[in-house]
C-alpha cells in the first residue's frame, strides 16, 4: 500500500492543483531558481515528456516540428526545454535541431537564410508584404537589412535595427520582413556555434551602421548588406568590432540543457555540456559516429589524485548512466575520444538518505589524457547505440592554477579540447568585412591602428590577456634560534666589530679625550676578513685566515688587516706562501687553530647563557614564576615547546605540558617543570578524593547513629508500655523495697548500655575526622613548601 503524503504543498499543474499524492516530484524550473512541485501523476507525465499531450490538448499554441512533424506546444513553460527555435524560422524538437545542425556543419556549407526556407512559406510571406512574386533572389539580398515593422519595438527598444527604418538608411525604399521573422525566431537557447562577441542587435551597432551607410556609395551597399547577412547567418565568426586580441575566445562555450535523459530538467546549469561545433564535429569524425553531448564535470583535487575514483553529479548519473540498486554497482564500459575502451566500476555510496555516485578505477584513464585538477571531463553518447564517450578539455593557464580553482562550468578562459585543433578565423582574412568603413567598426581610431594600440612589433594574434594571479610559495618554517644548527649563525657584537675594518687608503685623526686616544676616520668602515687569533706557549699571538680561492689556512701577523676578499696573492707577510700552489701548514697546527676557534665560540656562547641565567626575576615576575614553577625555578627547562611562543617559560597549560613531538613520553623519574606540575596536581587530586570519601563515611556513620538511637528509643518506649500494661504479679509484694530496687537497677543498666554504644560510634567518627584534618594539613604543608623555598 502506498502512503498518501499530505502537507502544505500543492501541485503546480493548473488543471490538477491537488495537495495529496503518493510522491511529490520536481518539474520545470521557475523564475525564482527553484523547481515546480508536481504530484506523482503530473510529475511522471513531465518526466516522460508527455505533459502537454496529456494536459494541454485543447489549448492553443500547438505547432509541428519543421523536420519530423512532431506536434510541439509552443509558449508553455512545461515544454520549454524540449523546443528549439530555428535560426531560419519555425520550431523544432531539441533532438532534430541538434542533429540537423551537425549535418549542416558536416557538409561544410552554410546556405543562405532564404535558401533553407520552404518555398511555400517564402511565397506566402512575399504575398502578405505586397511583394511581387517575380522578384529574384538578388533583389531580396539587395534590400537593406531592416527591422521595425513590428509592434514589439515600443516595448523592446534594445533589440533590433529600429533606426534603420529612416528614409536615409534605405536605398530602394523597400522593407524586408524576413529579417523581422529572423529576429522573432532568435533561439531561446543559443545554438552550439553561437559566439559571445558583439550582439548585432545592440543599439550602438545599429546606430553606427546607419551612420556608416550614409557615407558609402550604392555600389558598395550590396556588399555591405551581404556581409551583414553573413554575420547574422554565422554568429560564431568573430564580430567586426571585436579586437584581434579577443578573436581566440570569440567562440565562447555556452552551456545547453541536455536533450535526453531521465530527469534532465533537474540538471544544474554548471553540468550542461559546453561543446562547440568544431569539437563535436572533430570527435564525430574521429570515431565515425554521431555524438550527443550529455554533461561535463570539472575535476577536483581528489578526482585527479591517486585515489582512483571520480565523483559524478547525482542528477547526471541517474539521468544518463544505467540504474543500479546495489551499492557494489556494475562494471561500465566507456570509450575515450581516441577509440580506446575503458572499464570502470559504477557504484554509489549511501550518504544521508541519499546517494553519491562514483566511477572507480579512473586513474589510468585520467593519466593517459594527462589531466589534472581544474580540467574538465566530458561525457557524450553515441546515437544510435547508446555507447558512452568520455572526452576531456584542458583548462587555460593550468600553470597559474593552484589546485582546482575553477568551479563547474563557470570558466571564462579559453579552453581547448583534447584531440581538437582549433584555428580561430582571422578578421583580416574576411573580404567582406574589409570593405566595411571605419564607422562600422565601433572602435576608437587609436585602437583601430595596425598595432591595435600596442607596441610596434607585437603580433596581435599572440597577445593573451594576462590573468592576475598571486604566486603563493611554500610555507617557510620558522627559524628556531635556539637549535644547535642555527647557533652557528649567531654573531656577537665583538665578532661583528672584528669584521669592520677602516679603509686602508684613509689615515685616521687621533683625538685625546680624558687621556684616551681615539682614532677618527672620515670614510665609513669596510668589511674585513674573518680570522682566528691564537696564542703560542711563549705568549706570542698569531692570526690565521683562509684564502677565498684555495681555502687554505695561512699564518699572518696579529696586526694584519685583511680585506673582505683576500687570497694568497695578497699575502705580503710570508713570501713562501703567497701562491695558492704553496703547501698548507702542518696538520697539527691546523687542528690546534680549529680547536681554539671552536672553544672560543663555545666559551662565548656559554658566557652569554650564564649571563642570562644570572638575571633573576623580580617583583610580579618573580611571584608569577614562583607560583608556576615552585621550587624548580632554578632548574634548566627540559621539555620546552614552541607551540605557544608567547607563553612564559614553565607554562603548565594544556598545550605546553605536552611533550615535544618526536621525543616520546617523559620518564617516571623525570623532574622537569611539567612532570613536577603533573605530580603535584595528581597528589592534590588524590587527597581531594580521600577527603570526599572520608566525608561520605562520616555521613554514613551519623545516619547509622541516628537509626540506632531511634531504634533504642522505640525499644524503651515499648518496654515502658509493657510495664504499664503488664498484669499484676501476685507473687511480688508491691511494698517490698528490694524487688522495686532490683527492677530500677536493671532499667538503669540497660539505659547505660545503650548510651555506651552510641558514644563508641561517635568516638570512631571523631577519629576519622581527625585523620581527614591531618591529611588536609599535610596537603597544605606540601603546597606551602615550594613557596617558602622560593
Swiss-Prot record:
Organ and tissue specificity: Expressed in flowers and at lower levels in roots, stems and leaves.
UniProt function note: Transcriptional repressor of gene expression involved in embryonic pathways, such as LEC1, ABI3, and FUS3. Repressor of the sugar-inducible genes involved in the seed maturation program in seedlings. Plays an essential role in regulating the transition from seed maturation to seedling growth. Functionally redundant with VAL2/HSL1.
Binding site for Zn(2+): 547, 550, 568, 580
DNA-binding region: 295-396
Organism of this sequence: Arabidopsis thaliana (Mouse-ear cress)
One BP term from GO: response to abscisic acid
Residues forming coiled coils: 685-732
Protein name: B3 domain-containing transcription repressor VAL1
Location in the cell: Nucleus
Molecular-function GO terms, alphabetical: DNA binding; DNA-binding transcription factor activity; zinc ion binding
Complexes and interactors: Interacts with SNL1.
Annotated InterPro entries: B3_DNA-bd, DNA-bd_pseudobarrel_sf, Znf_CW
Originating gene: VAL1
Annotated Gene Ontology cellular component terms: mitochondrion; nucleus
Signal peptide: none
Amino acid at each position: 500500500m502506498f502512503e498518501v503524503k499530505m502537507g502544505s504543498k500543492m501541485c503546480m499543474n493548473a488543471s490538477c492543483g491537488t495537495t495529496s499524492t503518493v510522491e511529490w516530484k520536481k518539474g520545470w524550473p521557475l523564475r525564482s531558481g527553484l523547481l515546480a512541485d508536481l504530484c506523482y501523476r503530473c510529475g511522471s507525465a513531465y518526466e516522460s515528456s508527455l505533459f502537454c499531450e496529456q494536459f494541454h490538448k485543447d489549448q492553443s499554441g500547438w505547432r509541428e516540428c519543421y523536420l519530423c512533424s512532431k506536434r510541439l506546444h509552443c509558449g508553455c513553460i512545461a515544454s520549454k526545454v524540449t523546443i528549439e527555435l530555428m535560426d531560419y524560422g519555425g520550431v523544432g524538437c531539441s533532438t532534430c535541431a541538434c542533429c540537423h545542425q551537425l549535418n549542416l556543419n558536416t557538409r561544410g556549407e552554410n546556405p543562405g537564410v532564404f535558401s533553407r526556407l520552404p518555398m511555400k512559406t517564402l511565397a506566402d510571406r512575399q504575398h502578405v508584404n505586397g511583394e511581387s512574386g517575380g522578384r529574384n533572389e538578388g533583389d531580396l539580398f539587395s534590400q537593406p537589412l531592416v527591422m521595425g515593422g513590428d509592434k514589439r519595438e515600443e516595448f523592446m527598444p534594445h533589440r533590433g535595427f529600429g533606426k534603420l527604418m529612416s528614409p536615409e538608411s534605405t536605398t530602394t525604399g523597400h522593407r524586408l520582413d524576413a529579417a523581422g521573422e529572423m529576429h522573432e525566431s532568435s533561439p531561446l537557447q543559443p545554438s552550439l556555434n553561437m559566439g559571445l562577441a558583439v550582439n548585432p542587435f545592440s543599439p550602438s551597432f545599429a546606430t553606427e551602421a546607419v551612420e556608416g551607410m550614409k557615407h558609402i556609395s550604392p555600389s558598395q551597399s550590396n556588399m555591405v548588406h551581404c556581409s551583414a547577412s553573413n554575420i547574422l547567418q554565422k554568429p560564431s565568426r568573430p564580430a567586426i568590432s571585436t579586437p584581434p586580441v579577443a578573436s581566440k575566445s570569440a567562440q565562447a562555450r555556452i552551456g545547453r540543457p541536455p536533450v535526453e535523459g531521465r530527469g534532465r530538467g533537474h540538471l544544474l546549469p554548471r553540468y550542461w555540456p559546453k561543446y562547440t561545433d568544431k569539437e563535436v564535429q572533430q570527435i564525430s569524425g574521429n570515431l565515425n559516429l554521431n555524438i550527443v553531448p550529455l554533461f561535463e564535470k570539472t575535476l577536483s583535487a581528489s578526482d585527479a589524485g591517486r585515489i582512483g575514483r571520480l565523483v559524478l553529479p547525482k542528477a547526471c548519473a541517474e539521468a544518463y548512466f544505467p540504474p543500479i540498486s546495489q551499492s557494489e554497482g556494475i562494471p561500465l564500459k566507456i570509450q575515450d575520444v581516441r577509440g580506446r575502451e575503458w572499464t570502470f566500476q559504477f557504484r554509489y555510496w549511501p550518504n544521508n538518505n541519499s546517494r553519491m555516485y562514483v566511477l572507480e578505477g579512473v586513474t589510468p584513464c585520467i593519466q593517459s589524457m594527462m589531466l589534472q585538477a581544474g580540467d574538465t571531463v566530458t561525457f557524450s553518447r553515441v546515437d544510435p547505440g547508446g555507447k558512452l564517450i568520455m572526452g576531456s578539455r584542458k583548462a587555460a593557464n593550468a600553470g597559474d592554477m593552484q589546485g582546482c580553482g575553477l568551479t563547474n562550468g563557470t570558466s571564462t578562459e579559453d579552453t581547448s579540447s583534447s584531440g581538437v585543433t582549433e584555428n580561430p578565423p582571422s578578421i583580416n582574412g574576411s573580404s567582406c568585412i574589409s570593405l566595411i568603413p571605419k564607422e562600422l567598426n565601433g572602435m576608437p581610431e587609436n585602437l583601430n591602428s595596425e598595432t591595435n594600440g600596442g607596441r610596434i612589433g607585437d603580433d596581435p594574434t599572440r597577445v593573451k590577456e594576462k590573468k592576475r594571479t598571486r604566486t603563493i610559495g611554500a610555507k617557510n618554517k620558522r627559524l628556531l634560534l635556539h637549535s644547535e644548527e642555527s647557533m652557528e649563525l649567531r654573531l656577537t657584537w665583538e665578532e661583528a666589530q672584528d669584521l669592520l675594518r677602516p679603509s686602508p687608503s684613509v689615515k685616521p685623526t687621533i683625538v685625546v679625550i680624558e687621556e684616551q686616544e681615539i682614532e677618527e676616520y672620515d670614510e665609513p668602515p669596510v668589511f674585513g676578513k674573518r680570522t682566528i687569533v691564537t696564542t703560542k706557549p711563549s705568549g706570542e699571538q698569531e692570526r690565521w685566515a683562509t684564502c677565498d680561492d684555495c681555502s687554505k689556512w695561512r699564518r699572518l701577523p696579529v696586526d694584519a688587516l685583511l680585506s673582505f676578499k683576500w687570497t694568497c696573492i695578497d699575502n705580503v707577510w710570508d713570501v713562501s706562501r703567497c701562491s695558492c700552489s704553496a703547501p698548507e701548514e702542518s696538520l697539527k697546527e691546523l687542528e690546534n687553530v680549529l680547536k681554539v676557534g671552536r672553544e672560543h665560540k663555545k666559551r662565548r656562547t656559554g658566557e652569554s647563557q650564564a649571563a642570562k641565567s644570572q638575571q633573576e626575576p623580580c617583583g610580579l615576575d618573580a611571584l608569577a614564576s614562583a607560583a608556576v614553577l615552585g621550587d624548580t625555578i632554578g632548574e634548566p627547562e627540559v621539555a620546552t615547546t614552541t607551540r605557544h611562543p608567547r607563553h612564559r617559560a614553565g607554562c603548565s597549560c594544556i598545550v605546553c605540558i605536552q611533550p615535544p613531538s618526536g621525543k616520546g613520553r617523559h620518564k617516571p623519574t623525570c623532574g622537569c617543570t611539567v612532570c613536577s606540575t603533573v605530580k603535584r596536581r595528581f597528589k592534590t587530586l588524590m587527597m581531594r578524593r580521600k577527603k570526599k570519601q572520608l566525608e561520605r563515611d562520616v555521613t554514613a556513620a551519623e545516619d547509622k547513629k541516628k537509626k540506632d538511637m531511634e531504634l533504642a528509643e522505640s525499644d524503651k518506649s515499648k518496654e515502658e508500655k509493657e510495664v504499664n500494661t503488664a498484669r499484676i504479679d501476685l507473687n511480688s509484694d508491691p511494698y517490698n523495697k528490694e524487688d522495686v530496687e532490683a527492677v530500677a537497677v536493671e532499667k538503669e543498666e540497660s539505659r547505660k548500655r545503650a548510651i555506651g554504644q552510641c558514644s563508641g560510634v561517635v568516638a570512631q567518627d571523631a577519629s576519622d575526622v581527625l585523620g581527614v584534618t591531618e591529611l588536609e594539613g599535610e596537603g597544605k604543608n606540601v603546597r606551602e613548601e615550594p613557596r617558602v623555598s622560593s
